[in-house]
């Protein structure tokens, strides 16, 4: 009777090790790989394809943002700059942005939200690398540490995200759409959104947490609708027509409307705060909201082991920390000298620096010394 009791813990430990082996082995089957890794690869091929689409899409977005940034810098150096929206370079950046977002859109159709949403950190780290290589920005120690943490977090996310394969059909979306879990979630989200919107509009509260929470609440609806629309389009392409169902167009309207208002609040945040503050906070809020939406609407973590969930959340934490380190203190350096250099103006010979307006404080007057200055001038005139 004692022997079976001793072997039970060994069986449990063996099962845990087998699960870890399946999670940590994601390359193609080969001579050195066992049957577990081969089965894991075949079972998760479509997820890995979604991961590849998301990573490539985020990298393309990084390239597009740096191209647009370079076009702005290039136009600023011209004597008579034309509007940026007429620049071929800037327009090519916009097209690349659309291409990258298309990759993300397709990724949501073939992989879980909880796997694709956190991969947005690749856009931030990729943008930092491109800025160093092509825009000659400084590479800091915090950048290297942040990139390392982001890559480590991505590795854990890919391995420990929920291994579920869902065919997102119109009937499936309808079933989840009227489920009590989603209805409770939507009611709570609407209440929080209305309260924050009241304080934002009526009380003039423009704190970054308020603005980006509004963005995150809308983003949860965006990722739910994006996955539904993308999944139904994917099934329709394979021959199972889903575009005749009303739920497809309902989700399409939700996707467009949530995106529009999301951009509106995000623009308000970028106008009031620096990008080094907005980018990491928005990444954390958006990813958290998307993960919660995927868990509640699509039930992506249903039946997952505690260890798997814990390591997945730890991977999210590493990616969040990496984004904060990469974007930390990346504000533009401002010139400390208050003068205008005439050396680059055609037909003008530079003799000295032109001082600022004599009425300004930087001209040498004290903030409260206007009366004393005028008094001294008056004494000189009387004498």
Swiss-Prot record:
Highest taxon, organism lineage: Eukaryota
UniProt-listed Pfam families: Mg_trans_NIPA (PF05653)
Keyword line: Glycoprotein, Membrane, Transmembrane, Transmembrane helix
Glycosylation sites: 23, 33
One Gene Ontology MF term: magnesium ion transmembrane transporter activity
Keyword Cell inner membrane among UniProt keywords: no
Region (Disordered): 352-383
Subcellular location: Membrane
Membrane topology according to the record: Multi-pass membrane protein
One GO CC annotation: membrane
Spans through the membrane: 46-66, 88-108, 115-135, 144-164, 177-197, 208-228, 243-263, 278-298, 306-326
Record family assignment: Belongs to the NIPA family.
PANTHER family found in the cross-reference section: NIPA-LIKE PROTEIN 2, PTHR12570
Protein name, per record: NIPA-like protein 2
Record organism: Mus musculus
């Amino acid at each position: 009777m004692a022997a079976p009791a001793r072997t039970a813990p060994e069986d449990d430990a063996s099962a845990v090790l087998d699960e870890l082996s399946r999670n940590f082995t994601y390359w193609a089957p080969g001579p050195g790989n066992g049957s577990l890794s081969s089965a894991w690869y075949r079972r998760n091929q479509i997820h890995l394809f979604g991961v590849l689409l998301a990573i490539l899409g985020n990298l393309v977005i990084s390239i597009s943002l740096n191209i647009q940034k370079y076009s702005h810098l290039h136009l600023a150096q011209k004597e008579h700059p034309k509007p940026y929206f007429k620049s071929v370079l800037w327009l090519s950046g916009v097209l690349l942005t659309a291409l990258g977002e298309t990759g993300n859109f397709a990724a949501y159709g073939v992989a879980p939200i909880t796997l694709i949403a956190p991969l947005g950190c690749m856009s931030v780290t990729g943008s930092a690398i491109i800025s160093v290589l092509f825009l000659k920005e400084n590479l800091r120690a915090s950048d290297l540490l942040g990139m390392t943490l982001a890559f480590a977090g991505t590795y854990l996310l890919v391995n420990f995200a929920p291994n579920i394969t869902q065919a997102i059909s119109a009937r499936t979306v309808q079933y989840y759409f009227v489920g009590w879990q989603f209805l409770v979630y939507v009611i709570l989200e609407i209440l929080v959104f209305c309260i924050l919107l009241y304080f934002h509009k009526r009380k003039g509260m423009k704190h970054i947490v308020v603005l980006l929470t509004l963005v995150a609440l809308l983003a949860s609806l965006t990722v739910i609708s994006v996955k539904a629309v993308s999944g139904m389009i994917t099934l329709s392409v394979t021959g199972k027509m889903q575009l005749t169902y009303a739920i497809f167009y309902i989700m399409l309207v939700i996707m467009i409307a949530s995106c529009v208002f999301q951009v509106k609040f995000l623009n308000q945040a970028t106008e009031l705060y620096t990008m080094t503050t907005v980018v990491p906070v928005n990444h954390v809020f958006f990813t958290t909201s998307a993960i919660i939406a995927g868990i509640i609407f699509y039930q992506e973590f249903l039946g997952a082991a505690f260890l798997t969930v814990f390591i997945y959340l730890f991977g999210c934490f590493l990616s969040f920390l990496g984004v904060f380190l990469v974007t930390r203190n990346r504000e533009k350096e401002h010139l400390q000298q208050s003068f205008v250099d005439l050396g680059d103006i055609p037909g003008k010979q530079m003799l000295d620096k032109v001082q600022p307006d004599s009425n300004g404080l930087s001209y040498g007057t004290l903030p409260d010394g206007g009366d004393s200055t005028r008094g001294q001038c008056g004494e000189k005139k009387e004498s």
